[in-house]
Amino acid sequence: MDLAHVKDNHVDLYRILHIHVNDNEHLNSVTPTLINKQFRKLSLTLHPDKSNESDLNITRDRWDNLQSAYRILSEHKKEYDIWYQRTFLHSNRELLEKLEISEKAKKEKLISYDEIEKIQRYGQTLRKLVHFEIPISDWRNPSFTENTDDLNKLTETCLFRIKLVKRKEYNNEQKLNEWFRKIDIPITVQYYSENNDQREDDLVVYASARNVQTTIEILRTIENEKELHPDILEFTPAVEFEHFSFKEKVELDPSLGSIIYNSSDNPIIM
């Protein structure tokens, strides 16, 4: 292997001698003494008589490359270094400069208008999730419906006192709620009467509907059907039925109606 072959095949002689050259400073610091030292050091393991490599061809190639690298750098180091700098270090410097420019551009890149719009839409979605009490984990597929499972704010208004035939399963709140749903009475147990232990044949439970409209519908059902289920001995509202009844229709004041609907042609009828 001669100098021409090295240049044509882009052979890094310093790598063969295990000398790391990353820039011009490293290249200029490589002395003939260091080259000689590395050659003697590697000869202890790469010489055919001392190598542990079982493949003789590999052993011979490694030894020939080491000898060639030492000889060329001993005789033509100045010429080789000029070529090495232009071939390896120049390309490395260009790559480093491109990398630095790219990294700097990423840091200085301003957020585009489209990205700002995405952030704004994401913020709007989060606000909707909070408003409708939807778990944040569902943000990709939100269903904007209000949570009706929470405790009704008008619990006392929508409360019923219910006397039931005394059965073991009715003492279990979860089972009793399931039973109410099964017989199409949309109410949720709030608490049991403290006197149930003293009752022999019946028990009293207090349950509420989820809103006033549902409460009115239940009251109308009671009025029409009289009996909801044989096990329900009494079903009475905590608030008298009359409080939900409006026998007279009163037209809302036009000025107030226009404020609410922003139109005097669409008044509220009570």
Curated annotation (Swiss-Prot):
Belongs to the DnaJ family. The keyword Isomerase does not apply. PROSITE patterns: DNAJ_2. It comes from Kluyveromyces lactis (strain ATCC 8585 / CBS 2359 / DSM 70799 / NBRC 1267 / NRRL Y-1140 / WM37). Residues 12-84 form the J domain. One of its GO terms (biological process) is mRNA processing. Pfam families: DnaJ. It is found in: Cytoplasm; Nucleus. Keywords: Chaperone, Cytoplasm, mRNA processing, mRNA splicing, Nucleus, Spliceosome. InterPro entries: DnaJ_domain, J_dom_sf. This is Pre-mRNA-splicing factor CWC23. Involved in pre-mRNA splicing. May be involved in endoplasmic reticulum-associated protein degradation (ERAD) and required for growth at low and high temperatures. CDD domains: DnaJ. Associated with the spliceosome. One of its GO terms (cellular component) is cytoplasm. Its main location: cytoplasm.
